[in-house]
């Protein structure tokens, strides 16, 4: 069997993505390989120096997993490549490609992310930097078993400014392990972030892309650490804890959850590291919730939503509609993550502890419809999404839902 080099893209029918509903047409995998290889060989991982991540791989792979064909894949690529920068001289990407070629991608991830050496600890934290982009990218690479995309994700992590999240993670973990704070359901911790004056007011619109670093991690570090440390997963509850994190991410509608579903299924990753992956993701979600103004979470806003463009659509129809939207991949990632969340969360939505899972039943589809209805028009992401849902200023361009 030919071993795939870390500079090559070669998708196969054996790995075509989570939350898939329909098969892809003939020729889809071949075109996806061509587009992803072109992106890998031609474009910078950042289209601007701060807060500008290349989303082409995310978009193409999401559309592929959602059953899109050549037309939809070309749309996804064309919507993303026009503003990309050419590749510069590379260090991190070439380093991780050579390491993967020599050792294999699983061994490289074990060494550089999970070995608990000082370097691995720094890299593990860095996976969550840049609004989660490195771990999202890594998740795509593992999901589709593509060493080239795994190398890109590791290079993403290695090249990001830490932004003080390493201090936040380590302090939260130390406090959780001390036994001095009780474990609480994640949905209650979101409520605590909003009730606490310091965490609720720590974020500032004017902090821009540094809203987390200069917001809760600067103005309310002690408070957000204390709250975040209370999300704790027992070894026997990893599946439930993952579902709880995904459910609350959907409730807040601000954090993508897909990589967790991929990573917790990797038996070659030690159980304690898989638990850590989910705990850190949920804790960072709480910090980002504070950074974005801790908007009031009201279930009635979801259950009472009346779909517009998506009225009457079920998941199959919604997938098809999303694949045709001009976008850089955010709405496709969002909708696929919700469909995956529906599946992962379902076993825990009834019975003991069900209150920890606010999103239930058809609310998963309803949130996906909200996402599609409000982002289907236009190209500019600044007009598609509310950047800071807890700030009144961020809603000025948005019509009242009532």
Swiss-Prot record:
The highest taxon in the source lineage is: Eukaryota
Could you tell me the EC number(s) of this protein? 1.-.-.-
Q: How is it used?
A: Notoamides have been shown to exhibit antitumoral activities. Notoamides A-C show moderate cytotoxicity against HeLa and L1210 cells with IC(50) values in the range of 22-52 mg/ml, but the IC(50) value of notoamide D is greater than 100 mg/ml. Moreover, notoamide C induces G2/M-cell cycle arrest at a concentration of 6.3 mg/ml.
Q: Which UniProt keywords apply?
A: Oxidoreductase
Has keyword Oxidoreductase? yes
- Molecular function in Gene Ontology: oxidoreductase activity
InterPro entries linked: Questin_oxidase-like
Its annotated function is as follows: Baeyer-Villiger oxidase; part of the gene cluster that mediates the biosynthesis of notoamide, a fungal indole alkaloid that belongs to a family of natural products containing a characteristic bicyclo[2.2.2]diazaoctane core. The first step of notoamide biosynthesis involves coupling of L-proline and L-tryptophan by the bimodular NRPS notE, to produce cyclo-L-tryptophan-L-proline called brevianamide F.
| Family indicated by similarity | Belongs to the questin oxidase family.
Q: What is this protein called?
A: Baeyer-Villiger oxidase notM
Species whose genome carries this gene:
Aspergillus sp. (strain MF297-2)
Taxonomic lineage of the native organism: Eukaryota, Fungi, Dikarya, Ascomycota, Pezizomycotina
What is the gene name? notM
